[in-house]
């Protein structure tokens, strides 16, 4: 799912980030999937594109089939790393036949069974505003933070199903500009 959200009808969205001088990436762990973009200019358009990336999935039979061997190869690469092997054995030893024993990336067999329909079902279940957080980090003034948060609210309303609505209080900075940890 994480890989496929970079796909759009018009092509690979990561190329759009590159055109504006930004980088974008994602990762999935046991408890979260994070999509992030970094750049020093074009913050507004970068945020727009990030919400488009997570809010407009483009799943086709063709692009899902094309991604399966890529993900299987990535999984095989991880399975050659000693720290992955140790973690995998620890999970299997701790959880046995429970689903928690299976690596978050899945297995070669489970990856082969992915379809656009089950990707869409997983997306619909998990990619809702009430299950997502937006974080902006940088040297922003208080007014810039307020502008970014208003933009994030508008884009969330535009691109994401609500689930249970976030209150405005959920969209406040953790630290005011200029504060130290």
Stretch-by-stretch model annotation:
Residues 1-11:
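Catalytic Zn2+-binding segment of zinc metalloproteases
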